[in-house]
Amino acid sequence: MTRPYFTAYETRKPPVFAPMSARQRAIWHFLAGCAVAAGAYYLQWRWSASLNADALGFSMLVVGAETLFFLGTLLFYFDFWDEGDTPPRPYDGAAFEATSGAPAPQSVDIFITTYDEDVAVVAPSISDAKAVIAPEDMRVQIWLLDDGDRADMAQLAKHHGIGYFARRENLGFKAGNLRNGLLRTSGDLVVICDADTRLLPGFLQNTLGYFSDPQVAWVQTPHWFYDVPPGESWSDWIVRHIGGTPAHRLVRLAAAVLTWITGRGRIGADPFLADPTVFFDVIQRRRNRNNAAFCCGAASIHRREAVFAGAIKRKSAAVGRLQTRLRQPVATCLRALPLQPYRFHVSEDLYTSILLHEDAAAGWKSVYHPQVEARMLSPMSLTAWAAQRLKYAGGTFDIAAHDNPIFRRCLSWRQKLHYGATFWSYLNVLWAPILLLAPMVSLTTAVTPVKAYSLDFFMHFLPAVVLGELAMLAACKGYPVGPGRVLGVAALPVHWHAFICVLRGQKPRFAPTPKLPLVGGGLRHVLPHLVLLALMSGAAAVGIVRTALGHTGFSAPLLWVNLFWLGVNMTLIARLVPMAWWTPPEARQTEETQTEPEAAHGACQLAN
């Protein structure tokens, strides 16, 4: 057997995420204010002076979608407004007890969770966990938590001399697996790792100090996918295929245009838009200022006391409610309800974060540590990408529908807005299709959402769009925002699937994200995209022909404006299609690939 594909990236070094400078902050705040003013001015004009009276329903539908997007923008601006890093503290046991008034942690358990991952994926995670540097007075123990009860995992744990716990039933998904480990260990602090999470040696050195504050419940560190293909710059690609030099003005202009259209600075780089830098260094880092950075599972470290204290409170309340309803003895109710240190849910990390944040009596805090302390594998197939997006969306929709933190009394209004921004970003499945399909309607029927595509329209519309783009670029510290825009459109079919499942009263239950490249099965994930692209192409052809024939209502401004937006929408949709046949170059010469498992399809099943 040849080496796994990801060994080609072993020498990569993690990025260092610098804080936002005062100048960057001032520019961002100025542009945000301008964008909000321009957006409000545009919407005021849209509602009061631009509605098409001949197609009022269609016109109001479009401007309603625009308004909802603007409200989402306001939420995200609050989300992104400013950084608030928790000052890092070096760990010192004696100083810990002096400042916190509590005994210093004496032990740490490192949990590596696995279900169906290969030995090739899990073994490096164990080796790196063994290399983590710990304080001299700190006992560190590593445990492999196997939800697949596999002999090769038991043998792997034995070979490395680490602890091993297995389960034959999978009650509670990953949260149940973690509970199984928690109930059989005793570490004061618990590090959570997925099967592919490879801790860096300084993980404990750089995170333990935060726990000198006795109210800190967990510390989350960024996810860094070290195997994302680097790709090739557009300039080099143009030179290689067409000629010229990278410094030539036309080459640079063409490269800039291709970057804007595709949302990618390099061709072949990050094919599945997996790079989480914007989420972690922009969103999570800035939520930290309001104690609202939530746990993302892997590469986080937790205080056992906080996790169990919250679980005991919740179980006590649930037992009381059950006893009142069923009028059964307390002992019977206790046996009927499992203790859930991490909430039994497909999004156990987000759910448990909400529950701990709302515990006002305990006053638990979360800390987002902004520097990379672990490396992981990214989705390396369209099936893996779809499984991951389906899991995220299904879990988020389920929480929003059945236990929405917006209505929890003990969360601060700031925390509610931060969590609300997360839910809002998924709820755009309800209004994004309106703006996606509106150009098709106009091109085939000559029905427009505005009175006319006049100079007045462009004077209101262009400032709002341009300032909004500039503000987002400033907010993201120069990180590319195109991938996020592409992802928002490309993932709509997957998010609709998850939304319908939850709407039908089904609980999301999905297979783990495959950790190795998959062969085959990608085409079915882009069938909705291909159908939509065909319909959009047909609409463009109809619009061109009817305009050329001079049909009533068709005009050059209508044609060009809607062709432009249709082209933008088609570019966003088409971005995912080539990925159905993509495999990493390293995997093409190795045996470390998998055929697509049936379980990887992802489905919403009734909760067991």
Each model region followed by its residue ranges:
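C-terminal or late-domain output modules
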Residues: 382-385, 391-395, 399-459
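Loop-to-transmembrane boundary segments
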Residues: 14-31, 111-113, 118-122, 408-431, ...
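Internal catalytic domains of large membrane-associated glycosyltransferases
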Residues: 68-406
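Alpha-helical membrane-embedding segments
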Residues: 87-101, 116, 128-130, 197, ...
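Short, charged cytosolic
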Residues: 1-10, 388-408, 497-508
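Membrane-entry segments of alpha-helical transmembrane domains in multi-pass membrane proteins
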Residues: 27-29, 56-61, 287, 292-295, ...
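Hydrophobic transmembrane helical bundles of polytopic secretory-pathway membrane proteins
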Residues: 1-83
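Membrane-embedded multi-pass helical conduit in multi-pass membrane proteins
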Residues: 37-67, 425-509, 524-598, 608
